Amino acid sequence: MANSVQATKRARQAEKHRQHNAGMRAAMRTTVKKVLSAVEAGDKEAATAAFRVAQSSLDNMARKGLIAKNKAARNKSRINARIKAMA
């Protein structure tokens, strides 16, 4: 599809970045799911520990531009509310 060397290189780079970003996004989702599964199980200590990891992951993804800053804040707020509701 690309007609020039430059366009071919950009297509290669775009695919490489897409795969990297997909992996990072999947890792972020996994950290969030670990918190939610701990909340469902009723284990507040595990949920709190997992939340620290998820919070860091969400902030990193927002800083790198994989998700919007407000989405990270919204997710953290909702997860934290679920943890606090366990008490």
Swiss-Prot record:
Biological process, per Gene Ontology: translation
Region ranges (Disordered): 1-27
Gene3D superfamilies: Ribosomal protein S20 (1.20.58.110)
Pfam families, alphabetized: Ribosomal_S20p (PF01649)
Keywords, comma-separated and alphabetical: Ribonucleoprotein, Ribosomal protein, RNA-binding, rRNA-binding
Compositional bias per record (Basic residues), positions renumbered to this chain: 9-20
Gene Ontology CC, one term: cytosol
Any one GO MF annotation of this record: small ribosomal subunit rRNA binding
InterPro entries associated with the record: Ribosomal_bS20, Ribosomal_bS20_sf
NCBIfam families named among the record's database cross-references: S20
The family this protein is said to belong to: Belongs to the bacterial ribosomal protein bS20 family.
PANTHER family (alphabetical): 30S RIBOSOMAL PROTEIN S20, SMALL RIBOSOMAL SUBUNIT PROTEIN BS20C
Function: Binds directly to 16S ribosomal RNA.
Protein name: Small ribosomal subunit protein bS20
GN (gene name): rpsT
